[in-house]
């Protein structure tokens, strides 16, 4: 007797199963619009705001480098880096502050941009995807009138409703003290001030946070370069809520201004340090021995002229560091023949732009889903695909 025929497999129409499949599409801007072109059912799911949030959360740790917010002394604009059909239009992210106003871009992270609105003495947390803006008053205790400040923004994994801001600077009571505080949008308040001594003032030269390098997150800590009477790095441990100073392995304040030094993750893990001298890139790593003593160790040295096929005799200037994209672990390097991304562990590189004299270049990473509704998805497909 033959066994009964198994029932035919049901067509793929289960919302949950399809959602799990679509979640695993690459985090490129064209992925969901392309999926939505399959049929009305797929389009309904791909354009659903709730699914869009899930898609962004799923790819939070591997978002593409969408572009950079560049400041050319006249205005700030979004400079896209991806090729069509994944290229986010330049007009998609108009800058949050009008040209001519005084401000500093303090960094980008987790799809948010953090800005110090100097004329208002406020921090602005801006979500370019939604246009949402949150303004935060600087808490008491920071000498914002006399010194520079640094800050970093972050989100908890999968949380697109709340954020934290870490603020560091000089104490307004004792300028040779570094202070820090953390703001939570969940509570709407700043934590108590944390402090640590800075090097003493020398000939009127005060040590303060260097704003030319945005905060870099390595593990559970943020790092800033210190400018002035110091060759040190300021560390803020987010879990322990503590500040500490770490000596730089090499370099000085002049190297900061010339774009020769940057804090970054080390190869393998831990705290790293990139130092440029001419066409040579040195990769340093912070190591701790069995006695708990930490020190810097020089790892690899890389000839950038050979890696990037630069003619060292014809180059107008030496390479310099423009920025660092944390999630993609790539450094943005300026050269006279173009601006490159370099992944130093794999030695992979890509030319992004022709050379520009930009005052500031902040890499912007995130999962951009190209549209908020069905009609915008169709417009995206008509334009690019």
Predicted regions, residues:
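Short, conserved recognition motifs on repeat-domain binding surfaces
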Residues: 1-385
């Amino acid at each position: 007797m033959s066994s009964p025929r198994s029932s035919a497999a049901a067509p793929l129409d289960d919302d949950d199963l399809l959602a799990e499949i679509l979640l695993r599409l690459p985090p490129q801007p064209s992925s969901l619009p392309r999926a939505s072109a399959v049929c009305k059912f797929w389009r309904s799911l791909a354009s659903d705001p709730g699914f869009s949030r899930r898609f962004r959360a799923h790819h939070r740790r591997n978002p593409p480098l969408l572009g950079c917010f560049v400041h050319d002394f006249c205005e700030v604009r979004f400079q896209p880096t991806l090729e069509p059909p994944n290229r986010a239009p330049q007009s998609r992210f108009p800058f949050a502050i009008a040209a001519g106003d005084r401000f500093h871009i303090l960094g980008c992270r987790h799809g948010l941009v953090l800005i110090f609105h100097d004329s208002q003495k406020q921090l602005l947390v801006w979500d370019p995807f939604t246009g949402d803006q949150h303004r935060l008053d600087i808490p008491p205790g920071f000498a914002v009138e006399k010194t520079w400040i640094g800050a970093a923004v972050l989100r908890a994994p999968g949380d697109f409703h709340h954020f934290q801001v870490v603020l560091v600077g000089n104490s307004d009571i004792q300028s040779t003290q570094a202070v820090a505080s953390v703001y939570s949008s969940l509570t709407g308040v700043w934590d108590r001030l944390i402090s640590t001594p800075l090097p003493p003032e020398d000939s009127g030269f005060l040590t303060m946070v260097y704003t030319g390098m945005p905060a870099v997150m390595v593990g559970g800590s943020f790092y800033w370069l210190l400018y002035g009477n110091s060759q040190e790095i300021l560390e803020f441990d987010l879990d322990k809520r503590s500040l500490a100073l770490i000596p730089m392995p090499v370099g000085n304040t002049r190297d900061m201004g010339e774009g020769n030094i940057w804090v970054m993750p080390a190869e393998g893990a831990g705290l790293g340090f990139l130092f440029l001298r001419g066409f040579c890139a040195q990769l340093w790593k912070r190591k701790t021995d069995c006695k708990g003593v930490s020190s810097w160790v020089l790892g690899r040295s890389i000839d950038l002229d050979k890696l990037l096929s630069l003619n060292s005799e014809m180059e107008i200037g030496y390479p310099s560091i423009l920025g660092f994209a944390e999630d993609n672990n790539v450094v943005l390097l300026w050269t006279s023949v173009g601006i490159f991304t370099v992944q130093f562990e794999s030695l992979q590189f890509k030319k992004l732009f022709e050379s520009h004299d930009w005052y500031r270049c902040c890499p912007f990473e995130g999962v951009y889903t190209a549209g908020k509704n069905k009609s915008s998805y169709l417009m995206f497909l008509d334009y690019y695909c």
